[in-house]
Design a protein with these regions (language model features):
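Short acidic, Gly/Ser-rich segments with clustered Asp/Glu that frequently serve as metal-coordination loops
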Residues: 25-33
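Metal-dependent phosphoesterase core characteristic of DEDDh/y 3'-5' exonuclease domains
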Residues: 2, 13-20, 33-78, 97-172
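A generic local structural motif
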Residues: 6-9, 91-94, 134-135
Length: 172
């Protein structure tokens, strides 16, 4: 019997893609409505073999740190001094929006990353384009690429181990 994976974000076909984008976010907690993104990494592999690698720390606002999980901060290696010169989310939002606008996108536990990105954009009054509206990051629009591929869901299907975290996947 084939396993079915329920995800909140659509997965799809990547056979016609000109590029594929991998991304990961590190956050201050598990709750996207209260947490801040501390770091984001985005890697785009283009069909011509070129690769675009972009990563940045993101300085959280003090109010966002009020809801931070000490365990999440420890996992991310957060300390105020190392993040002092990092940009605020709104200073790099247009870069993130442009890099993630075109599919396919890949992440491990992608629903977590997408939920945190959408919440961060919306807190800064960014919006998703209306149907048939042209995407424009300069107009404070964000769009998450499609299809979305979740390596955690794939690991659950194809690597039935006790854990599906990235450390376990690296071992196989």
């Amino acid at each position: 019997m084939k396993k079915q994976i329920a995800t909140g974000y659509k997965m799809g076909n990547i056979t016609t893609a000109k590029a594929i984008t991998f991304f990961d976010v590190e956050t201050t907690s598990l709750d996207p409505e209260k947490s801040a993104i501390l770091q984001i990494s985005i890697i785009t592999d283009w069909e011509d073999g070129n690769q675009d690698v972009w990563t940045t720390k993101i300085k959280p606002r003090d109010v966002e740190l009020n809801y931070a999980s000490s365990e999440a901060l420890k996992i991310c290696g957060y300390n105020k001094d190392d993040w002092e010169d990092a940009p605020l989310f709104e200073e790099v939002a247009h870069i993130i929006a442009k890099k993630l606008a075109w599919g396919p996108i890949v992440a491990h536990n992608i629903n977590f990353d997408i939920a945190h990105l959408k919440a961060s954009f919306k807190r800064r009054k960014w919006r998703e384009p209306e149907r048939n509206e042209k995407f424009d990051a300069e107009k404070k629009m964000f769009k998450i690429g499609y299809p979305a591929i979740d390596t955690c869901a794939l690991a659950y299907i194809y690597l039935p181990t006790e854990r599906q975290n990235l450390d376990t996947l690296r071992e196989h």
